[in-house]
Swiss-Prot record:
Database matches in Gene3D superfamilies: Metal-dependent hydrolases (3.20.20.140), Urease, subunit C, domain 1 (2.30.40.10)
Subcellular location: Cytoplasm
The protein, known as: Imidazolonepropionase
Species per Swiss-Prot/TrEMBL record: Cereibacter sphaeroides (strain KD131 / KCTC 12085) (Rhodobacter sphaeroides)
Lineage: Bacteria, Pseudomonadati, Pseudomonadota, Alphaproteobacteria, Rhodobacterales
Cofactor annotation comment: Binds 1 zinc or iron ion per subunit.
GO cellular component: cytoplasm
Protein's gene: hutI
Length: 395
């Protein structure tokens, strides 16, 4: 048991939920009490003076592709020089290049490539990260990616949630045969992943260049049979009704949503599905149509913010910068951005005991060299993290 005293606490219980001159009583991995320090119940627990610093829940990055091999820097240069998507692909770039590099990497090599990315996230105050498969597109590599993600959670003080994203793209060896790919690779891999305890949710990419709503509906039906929750990349490049599809399947989240329409907004609101906004991909792809944040806000749809860390369209590993981008590019408020990387991000992962500072919640905390929580979205640059607690222990 211990006390953190002399804090400004943003509980996220009601807006920022700011409590000045606050203390937090922690027992084991749980918060037992939070409030004005003058009202702290008598306790013999040791007290740590935090010097008047700001305390928030540890941040949650609820959408990443952090396990992969290789880079896509060469095609970045090609695109800047005017190369089309087809020209990049013909030169060996695009998602296929990441798939080939990831397939060729051993588990140890994937782990060695991924850990520095995770370490950078943790240095920015992240305490929970979602990691997807999706760069194997064969049974062996999809499972290897998920095993590496689980290993990361064992090696670092971070909570890792995994999403099986076998339906990310159709690999070259199944070009023109997406149904066969789903039947022969995706569904068998999903079953093995579930049997091995490697998967927390099932994800898919609903887009003309990926999978149709009907194909995804079939995949989600199989996920439900395995008692696995679902989430969906939807309405990023066009509107295929992916958000409404996600809502019909009680998805935890629908992600991207640049081309979301009024029907999709209403469906998300009715289902309680979280809208995950990914400003890094919007920025890197130089998109011009932003998600309909005002409509989502008016409908009461919870909005999360994530990095979408991946080598092709969002090589962004700093969640604080994603918060700034969400405010600057999508017009979220700093309060919404913080909620989007704490309580709403937790909801997008199906987690109900992190993302707020309240009795009974896990003691996943970030203590910052900051006076006000708006500073976390205002800053462009290194996160002002002082120290992080993971399940009640200083990291």
């Amino acid at each position: 048991m211990m006390i953190l005293g002399n804090l400004r606490v943003a509980t996220l219980s009601d807006g920022y939920g700011l409590i000045p001159d606050a203390a937090i009583l922690i027992e084991g991995d749980r918060i037992q009490w939070v409030g004005p320090e003058a009202h702290l119940p008598p306790s013999a627990a040791p007290r740590h003076d935090m010097g008047g610093r700001l305390c928030t829940p540890a941040l949650i990055d609820c959408h990443t592709h952090a396990v992969f091999a290789g880079t896509r820097a060469a095609e970045f240069e090609m695109r800047l020089k005017g190369a089309s998507y087809a020209e990049v692909a013909a030169a060996g770039g695009g998602i296929v290049s990441t798939v080939m590099a990831t397939r060729a990497a051993s588990a140890d090599e994937l782990l060695a490539a991924s850990l520095p990315r995770i370490d950078a996230m943790l240095a920015g105050g992240v305490g929970t990260v979602e990691i997807k498969s999706g760069y194997g597109l064969d049974i062996e590599t999809e499972l290897r990616m998920l095993r590496v993600a689980r290993r990361i959670g064992q090696l670092r003080k971070v909570r890792v949630r995994t999403s099986f994203l076998g339906a990310h793209a159709v690999p070259p060896d199944y070009r023109g045969r997406p149904d066969a790919y789903l039947a022969e690779v995706v569904l068998p891999a999903l079953k093995v992943a579930q049997d091995e305890g490697l998967v927390d949710a099932v994800d898919a990419f609903c887009e003309g260049i990926a999978f149709s709503p009907a194909q995804i509906a079939h995949l989600f039906a199989q996920a439900h049979k395995l008692r696995l929750p679902v989430k969906l990349h939807a309405e990023q490049l066009s509107n295929l009704g992916g958000a409404a599809l996600a809502a019909r399947h009680d998805a935890l989240s629908a992600d991207h949503l640049e081309y979301l329409d009024a029907e999709g907004v209403a469906a998300l609101a009715a289902a309680g599905t979280v809208a995950v906004l990914l400003p890094g991909a919007f920025y890197a792809l130089r998109e011009t149509q932003a998600p309909p944040v005002a409509a989502l806000r008016a409908a009461g749809v919870p909005m999360a913010v994530a990095t979408d860390l991946n080598p092709g369209t969002s090589p962004l590993g700093a969640l604080g910068l994603a918060m700034n981008m969400a405010c600057t590019l999508f017009r979220l408020t700093p309060e919404e951005a913080l909620a989007g990387t704490t309580i709403h991000a937790a909801r997008a992962l199906g987690l109900s005991d992190i993302g707020r500072i309240a009795p009974g919640f896990r003691a996943d905390l970030a203590i910052w060299e900051a006076e006000h929580p708006a500073e976390l979205s205002w800053r462009i640059g290194p996160a002002p993290l002082h120290v992080r607690l993971h399940e009640g222990e200083f990291v």
